[in-house]
């Protein structure tokens, strides 16, 4: 009989002003969580760069005064970051270099653009998954 044991899922939520000077805080949380779960240094570097790409995209799209909401979930060998802002513009229809870079750094990128609470507002959500390949 095989015994399967898994670490419990860990979720951390963070809400900051949608401004570029907040990116170091988000990066620090992502790095710390990935490090604590045994991601390799190269994987942590990829996660950190992906956080920058997602954060910059959402900050550019955010409505003035909209917070940037982040949910970090680490379960088993997967690191999932889900981010969201309120926007009047939404995400670009045809993502360019920023999105190609994000896809190269991560294993999966998910985006959605939902109707917001007020007229003309959109709830823009971007998430990515990074799998841990090796062990330190």
Language-model-detected regions and their locations in the chain:
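Conserved ATP-binding N-box helix of the HATPase_c
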Residues: 40-65
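Conserved beta-strand-loop-beta-strand hairpin that lines the nucleotide-binding pocket
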Residues: 1-13, 57-136
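Bergerat-fold GHKL ATPase/HATPase_c domain
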Residues: 1-49
């Amino acid at each position: 009989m095989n015994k399967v044991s898994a670490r419990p899922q860990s979720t951390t939520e963070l809400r900051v002003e949608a401004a570029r000077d907040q990116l170091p805080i988000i990066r620090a949380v992502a790095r710390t969580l990935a490090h604590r779960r045994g991601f390799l240094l190269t994987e942590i570097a990829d996660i950190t760069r992906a956080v920058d790409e997602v954060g910059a995209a959402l900050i550019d799209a955010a409505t003035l005064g909209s917070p940037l909401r982040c949910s970090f979930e680490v379960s088993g060998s997967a690191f999932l970051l889900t981010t969201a802002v309120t926007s009047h513009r939404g995400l670009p229809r045809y993502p360019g270099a920023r999105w190609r870079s994000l896809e190269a750094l991560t294993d999966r990128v998910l985006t959605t653009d939902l109707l917001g609470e007020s007229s003309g507002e959109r709830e823009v959500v971007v998430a990515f998954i990074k799998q841990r390949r090796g062990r330190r």
